[in-house]
Amino acid sequence: MNDKKILFFDIDGTLLTPPPFKVPEGTSRALTKAHENGHLLFINTGRTKVMMPSALSELHFDGYIYGCGTHIYMDNKLLFFRTVPNLLCKETVDLLRKYKIEAIFESNTEILYDGASPAQSEFGVKMRKEIPMVDITKFNREDACTYSYDKFLVHMLPDSDVEKFRSFCNDHYTYFDHGDGIWEVTQKGTSKATGMEFLLDRLSIPKEDCYAFGDSPNDLPMLKAAGVSVAMGNAYGGIEEHCTYQTSAVDRDGILHALEHLDLI
């Protein structure tokens, strides 16, 4: 067995298959063996804590980085958190209405939507049926200063003013364009990479002992910051060009093959 390493895993497309969102048996077996070998295992996801899939509940992880670096836990203890300031939250909601852009806001404890937005689509209706959400308009004048979120997802519609919102995002946020009008918008200064680097510093683990596994453009900061980076076989957006190794797809035991190839199990 090699010396102890620290491993960071994206969720969607890396540990979980596409719908119905299952953990492949080979992945479960590989993670169990890696834990038995003494390696530290962390989830590093764009999802906020409230959006954690139940399919991962039976797997062992030493900690979690949620919301692209906005909440960091280890051994069930919160080590770091950062949310979007309330004034910026309110400005963002106002501009999303003005620019006719649909949005879903993600915090550590709840998912919000804007029932007063002029931008409504079947996509948003479907999401609200699948995921419990709170209408942001419930926050009236008295408690409007009490809400915040960590990141948000936007859905561009045919009449959305995309370029004006892009300019606003460039000033205040970081965003990832996932195609089909879907953007993932995150806080400036936090990312999967900053979350990972926080833990490396806290645990005094050198970069060369850090391994990262992902499949999408929002994994790129994490993959670039790791000592060893692994792109899944189903990776997109050209991220494999920046990785040490590309394994097979998530539903073809990509994690199992990668951990074996890297002599971690």
Language-model regions: role of each:
Residues 50-54, 164, 195, 221-222, ...:
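Phosphate- and divalent-cation-binding pockets in alpha/beta enzyme and binding domains
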Residues 59-60, 68, 168-172, 225-226, ...:
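Short, structured coil segments at secondary-structure junctions
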Residues 5-20:
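Asp-based phosphoryl-transfer active-site loop
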Residues 34, 45, 152, 223, ...:
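Residue-level signal for inorganic ion chemistry
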Residues 225, 229-265:
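Asp-based, Mg2+/Mn2+-dependent phosphohydrolase catalytic module
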Residues 2, 39, 198-209, 262-265:
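Glycine-rich phosphate-binding loop signature in dinucleotide/nucleotide-binding domains
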Residues 99-213, 217-225, 234:
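Conserved acidic, metal-coordinating active-site core of Asp-based
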Residues 26-122:
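Active-site phosphate-binding/coordination module
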